[in-house]
């Protein structure tokens, strides 16, 4: 055993070293958590957790997880000579809807985000045929890319969105909307906030970590697809009413409640980050609904958002007589 005298440890110096280590770990964690691929994985699992947590399974509700990504679904339809030969058709229609004793699906909830390109619209068309055959609506999502923009903030700045959607880029989209099976497709937007950034109000527990986010943008925050919020409202409606139709309006089952509100310092006080990618005006919400989308609108100065409508992608038929329309 050494008889060398140990100098007194400087506690402040040691605390400083520990603080620097925490800072280095925090920077590494920021890079991981804000990586696009990691965000997609975390968003998916937290969205599933959100739906499971909001579902009362004592109300005869079942959730089935199907492990398939968007590209695999595209390949499934491309490899099949026709839709009825696809694996999705077999699983949803043949194995359940068309089999005695089977348990038909009420709806298919997906995290998939669609754009207005040929590949995605071909996929939506194939899915709509399966959904129509099994009377099982399919829910997907659209983002800024659908509208040819980089962010949803740019989308809400489109002045005449009805005229904008008549551009040549949306010929396939408008053709799809005219199809009969389009009534079995629902596309939601924008996304909602899944969790607060880690820090004082959402501590990690094992060490001091303050997640670095820019409150003026949306990139570093963790967003969830609105399909899962709508699905949670559907399960709640089924529990309370025995069916899934009470899912619209603040008093009619459309609320998405208790959303996280992040407050950040802007130098002259605290600013609140709304739990939605963008704030939709009533006029914009109505316009998007009439264009075949299901908008999730944040209720200003509150902690909830709301689905005011639940339109399918199908374009309503117009007749000479108003009552017929």
List each model region and its residues.
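Structure-specific endonuclease nuclease cores
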Residues: 60-71, 76-91, 95, 99-106
């Amino acid at each position: 055993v050494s008889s060398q005298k140990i100098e007194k440890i400087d506690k402040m110096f040691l605390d400083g070293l520990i603080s620097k280590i925490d800072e280095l770990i925090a920077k590494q964690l920021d890079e991981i958590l804000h990586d696009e691929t990691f965000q997609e994985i975390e968003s998916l699992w937290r969205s599933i957790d959100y739906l499971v947590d909001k579902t009362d399974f004592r109300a005869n509700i079942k959730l089935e997880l199907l492990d398939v990504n968007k590209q695999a679904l595209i390949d499934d339809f491309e490899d099949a000579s026709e839709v009825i030969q696809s694996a999705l058709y077999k699983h949803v229609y043949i194995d359940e809807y068309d089999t005695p004793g089977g348990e038909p699906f009420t709806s298919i909830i997906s995290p998939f985000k669609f754009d207005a390109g040929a590949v995605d619209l071909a996929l939506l068309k194939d899915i709509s045929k399966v959904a129509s055959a099994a009377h099982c609506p399919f829910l997907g999502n659209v983002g800024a890319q659908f509208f040819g923009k980089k962010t949803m903030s740019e989308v809400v700045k489109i002045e005449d969105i009805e005229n904008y959607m008549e551009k040549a880029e949306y010929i396939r989209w408008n053709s799809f909307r005219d199809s009969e099976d389009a009534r079995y497709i629902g596309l939601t937007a924008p996304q909602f906030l899944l969790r607060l950034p880690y820090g004082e109000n959402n501590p990690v527990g094992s060490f001091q970590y303050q997640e670095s986010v820019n409150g003026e943008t949306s990139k570093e925050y963790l967003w969830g697809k609105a399909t899962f919020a709508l699905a949670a409202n559907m399960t709640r409606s089924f529990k309370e009413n025995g069916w899934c139709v009470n899912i619209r309006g603040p008093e009619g089952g459309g609320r998405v409640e208790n959303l996280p509100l992040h407050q950040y310092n802007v130098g002259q006080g605290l600013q609140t980050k709304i739990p939605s990618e963008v704030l939709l005006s009533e006029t914009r919400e109505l316009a998007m609904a009439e264009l075949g989308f299901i908008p999730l609108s944040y209720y200003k100065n509150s902690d909830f958002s709301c689905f005011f409508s639940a339109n399918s992608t199908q374009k309503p038929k117009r007749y000479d007589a108003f009552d017929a329309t």
